[in-house]
Amino acid sequence: LADEYINAEQRFGYWKDAAIRLEGAAVWNFTVMFLNVWNAFRPQETDYTAFAPTRLPAVQDGVVQPYADSPLDEEPLAETVYLDILSQAQRYVYIYTPYLAVGEEMLDALKSAAKRGVDVRLILPGIPDKKLVFRLSRSYYLPLLRAGVRIYEFTPGFLHAKCYVSDDRVAA
């Protein structure tokens, strides 16, 4: 955490992020995923029950499927989720990310979705916090633009948000 995250300090201009509020069983799932990694690197295990919910609110609307990448395995779970969103998109996929550092499979998936008529938009920072990653991100622009991907840069400050939104039905 840093002061720029709450715009108390403006090292990169206005800091733009995204957040959601979750309640219910998904929160416990995320807690367990965090504690699994936390405990793997601690000499003494943290007691999970200290963080267990005492009550769960009634389900409102929608479905939340918790997932997380972990340094404890080789499974690229988040990438698999993102590739699935791109392959199933029919109308649009909007992606906000501060760092576009992708492999060939993801690059191909972005281009393929655009070529089959999906409105693929990337929203990236126009002001870098990490210059090397900023240059890497921009190195993908030309092949993506040629495939029909629309690329926007957030310039009032630094875009730190990380979101995939597709077809009014799924977000990550």
Name each model-derived stretch.
Residues L1-A172:
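Charged, low-complexity intrinsically disordered terminal segments
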